[in-house]
Amino acid sequence: MMKEHAKLMKVIFSAGEVVGRKKLQKMIYIAKKVNLPFYEKYNFHFYGPYSEELTLRIEELCNLGFLHEVHEKKGGYFQYRYSLTDAGSDFLRHYDVEMPPLKDCILDLNEQNSRFLELVSTVLFFDGLQQEEVKEKVFTLKSKQRYTEEEILEAYHYIDKIKGLVTEELVKD
């Protein structure tokens, strides 16, 4: 049970802090799609790929006292900040998590805004389609986000960049 929880904790530890539930969902999904060992099931929802399993794991880690969740009122909505507690850090020190190196990848993902990660994860969700078909899906399913063709192209370049970071980290290890 705790293996998948520990992987999630390792991501948050590597990031230092993750601001936003949606952002954390997208970071894990993108990491999964670039062959990092995450196994949560994802379905397509309003904000792109979403995993109920991941939401439950986060809740469990908060309940166990391993993850600190801060609710902040920002404008007309609540925003959540996630970081490891001291107990979570202690747990990670004593739990041998089999993970490829991921710090550079996670730090880069964490630097991106949620809107862009939503686009990247949506592009990855439809990775079996041709680029033109993916573009049409984005324009249809994400019409309210008003993504441009340039942003979609940027998402493809970013996916290549993240895959490269993962490969570099594996070679360094």
Each model region followed by its residue ranges:
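Domain-edge interaction signal
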Residues: 1-173
